[in-house]
Amino acid sequence: MVAQFASAVEDLLEVKHWLWCHYRPARRKDGSWYTPLSGHKGLMDYIATKDGRLLLFELKSDKGKLTDDQLIWKCELSLTGAEIYTWRPTDWPFIQETLTK
């Protein structure tokens, strides 16, 4: 479900001409997951910019929760003036509105 949701968000980013990037996790041979980045854990998975706006957002299932590390990033980033979101499939109308502004 989250993969379909992510695909829909990515399609909308493209259609609305956002410059965007998604940090995708990778699976190790032992089956564990990691995101090959240096620094502190928990950075939002998506970054997008258009017309002077900067968005950082995390996509979650309807029951998914941010980790403690993600909450720290969200709090710190909210002080910068960037738009910080946690989006779920039920947020689709708001997502469309946000990416269409």
Where are these regions (language model features)?
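Catalytic phosphate/metal-binding cores of nucleic-acid and nucleotide-processing enzymes, i.e., regions
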Residues: 1-101
